[in-house]
Amino acid sequence: DLFDDEELLKDFELNSTGFWSFIKGDDKYSRQKLSGDLERLRSYYLDRGYINFSIESTQVSVTPDRRSVFITVNVAEGEQYTVNEVSLAGDLVVGEEQLEPLLIVKKGQVFSQQLVTYTNDLLKRRLGNEGYTFAEVNGRDHNANDEDNTVDVTFYVEPGRKVYVRRINFSGNAKTDDEVLRRELRQFEQAPANTSLVDLSRQRLQRLGYFSVVEADTPRVPNSEDLVDVEYKVEEQPSGSIGANVGFSDASGFIFGANVTQNNWRGSGNRVSFALSRS
């Protein structure tokens, strides 16, 4: 075996009975948990170059008293493969010279499905910055050479239609005026949808400090192939503070003070402070 059992089992949700199992409950058999664990096992090998890894069989047996379950997983590990050639294919609406620097899968590396997935995401985000919000990128390994254990990887690009923003909407801002939110936006209506600008706008809304949660979505406009709306959903949180203090002086005796600060006065986005003192 290439990897010892302890290494392979450390990410399993199912676990053998141990000291902490009573508290964590991770020693209770579940078919769903086992299915997830087998998928994690498959990913473990694919991320380390074993492209022909397979699970040959899984046996689950129960003891006569039905108090314990034994699980045996038989696998075929295969050989480790390295990357030979990396290429782009499909409709490259964004120039190849701009996409190639995003290919983190490199010739000579041990093949990793995780790096392929990361590269898919980077390419989709780059296309999304040019208005191709619903682009699909699928990195595939092919042309496996069993003599030198190498494999080619090609990223197939399907950009889809370029889309534009019809309208930007807000929900959940019961106290805060839309205009306060709108001035933080870097994605604009009628402009091409830009994944990075939509996310930058979400970050700017979050940094206002008025909201505990800010979520962004870009649903398609019904009956349109090239229009989306941008939906920002927020959850408001308290944006003010109250303070009090007590002091003493020979001339005035005890001095009592209080201050109130509101960072989003009446939903306008303005900061207002009040201070009172009495002796």
Question: Regions from the language model: what does each represent?
Answer:
Residues 1-250, 259, 273-278:
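Periplasmic polypeptide-binding modules associated with outer-membrane biogenesis and secretion
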Residues 265-271:
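Short loop/turn motifs that connect adjacent beta-strands in outer-membrane beta-barrel proteins
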